[in-house]
Amino acid sequence: MSQIAGFDAAPASELRPRLLALTESPLWADQLLGERPYGDLEHLLDASDRIIRALPADQVDAALAGHPRIGERASGLDPEAAARSAREQAGMSRADPETASAMAEGNADYEARFGRIYLVAAAGRSAADLLAFLRERLRHDPETELDVVRGELARITRLRLAGDFGTSGQEAS
């Protein structure tokens, strides 16, 4: 049985905790489970994207609870989630002290402006790229930025879902 077939057939009570470990939005998890079956990975990923992009602000904020600040080590997460976060933010681990300091300052500015952590799909991006993206996003109005956060959350969740439920030969696109 493929992982997607298993996902489609498994009890919601078994899958919900796994989904919430990927993105801590109960509404997202419940809607994703409620729309089964998907049949293949791409349909699952597309549904996830659509649901996340429609989340109300409070559910976006709930989802952010499982994400550490960019450039900070994950604390309070289970070891698997902390390791995943470290892999996703690997570019920041190679940041020079000046860039790391600027990122910490930018994180504080972002949180003061928007009331939530700066979320970006960090996998594969350098520290300099992450900092430049942060500075660009600080110029957004709150509504535009919330849409950007939803898009970044969708990208991160897509990668995590593909990692957890993809079958060999299938990747997130």
Where are these regions (language model features)?
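Short glycine-enriched loops at secondary-structure junctions
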Residues: 123-125
